Structure formats: structure tokens, C-alpha cells
Amino acid sequence: MDTSQLKERVAYHAIDTLFSEGKIFDGMKIGLGTGSTAMPAVHRLAQLLSSGKLKKIYAVPTSFQTSIECEKLGIPIYSLSSQQIGGSLDLAIDGADEIDPDKNLIKGGGAALLKEKIIAYNSKEFVVIADERKKVKSMGKGFALPIEIIPEARLSITKALEAQGIEVFLREGVKKMGPVVTDNGNFIIDVKWPKAADVDPKALEESLNKITGVVENGFFTKNTPRVFIVHQDGNIEDL
């Protein structure tokens, strides 16, 4: 199977497993992630709805990408602050860019990390779907950590991080001149630590956000997710 087939396989398996366990149910409030692994999960939910196996859900998307896909598929969407949602969700499902042995995550490859974190941290259960390439022994040295920043603070933040020996890259747009602009009107920087550095995701999630002008960073350490991992041979781990 190619990568897209593996992503569809793990997404469908996760949705079907959660449905069979009663964790996806009529009238539930569900957060829907962003990216190439999360989209098949949205499609599978749409299939359950169109078949009548699932009658109604209250979906909260984490990005414009997900909102548009839900609209195409006929899934009604809400915000976390909608009266029907009330600020909390039953479950959220999303992909990840890196997963360490403690199930800490790096997310934000799709530049939607701020809303992804708001949704994940306000859900009773958080489910992550990914392929085996996303499992790592340590974080912040392979896949660069995305950080959402206020544009005006770009240079001051860059200098503060570089003073700690951290490499900083302003993410450039594709089919758009200049930097990536998030759904919230901010910039994304991607940062990497030296290979010899001791990267502590839990501590860094807190300390990075204390830098003036940082909106949010892509470490997700505060709620341990249930993780579905698909391997190249098609087998799926439920961690």
C-alpha cells in the first residue's frame, strides 16, 4: 500500500473502532483535525452519517481546510463557543507529525496548531492517527517544531531562540509570495534543536509560550492521546 492508502486505512479503522466501542455516537460533540491523515477520518464519518448508522453529530473543525471539507460532505459545523458545544467536546481526532514513546506529540505541519491544540485540550478524549514514520525516540531534531507567532515579533523571537542555539526558519508560502499566514493571521516559524540537545517537550511547551509574541507552539503534552499507528504491511497498533 502507498502512503495515502495507509492513511486511509488507519483513519477508517480508528473511526470504525471508536464507533463500535460507542465512543462515536448520535448527538456527540467531536473535534475534527487537519491534514492528509485526518481528512479520511472526516470522510468515514460522512459515510456513517449518509448510511444512517450515525444520525447526527456536532462537528468542530480545526481549520478552514476541515471546515470546507465538512461543508462538501454535508457535515454541519460549529465552533467551540457555539451554544450547542458549550466549550467542551466528547472526543477529538487528528493526525500528528511526531509521536515519542510517552505519546507526546509535535503537530502543526499544516499550520493549524493553535486551533488543533484548543480543540484537543478541551476534549474528554483525544485520538491520534498516524503512520509508523511518525514514531520517534526523541523530539525536535527531525521534524522541526512549528511555532505560531505574531508577525510584529518575528525578529525578536528569532533572536531569542537563536541565542539558545536553536535553528529558526520562517515558513514560506506555496503558490503565495512571502510567509505562510495562518487561519488566525499569524506567521509560522519552524525550529530545530542541536542533535546533542536535551529536548524536554513538557518543559518546552510551557517555556516557549512565555516568549513575548509567541501565540502557541506545536508540542502537545498535556493530555495523553489514544494512538492508532499503521505499519507498512497494513497492520495497525492501538496504543
UniProtKB/Swiss-Prot annotation:
Q: What GO molecular function terms would the record report?
A: ribose-5-phosphate isomerase activity
What is the recorded name of this protein? Ribose-5-phosphate isomerase A
Keyword Glycosyltransferase belongs to the record: no
The UniProt entry's GO CC annotations, sorted and at most eight, read: cytosol
Function, as annotated, reads: Catalyzes the reversible conversion of ribose-5-phosphate to ribulose 5-phosphate.
Q: Which reaction does it catalyse?
A: aldehydo-D-ribose 5-phosphate = D-ribulose 5-phosphate
Q: Give the EC number(s) under which this enzyme is classified.
A: 5.3.1.6
Q: Which GO terms describe its biological process?
A: D-ribose metabolic process; pentose-phosphate shunt, non-oxidative branch
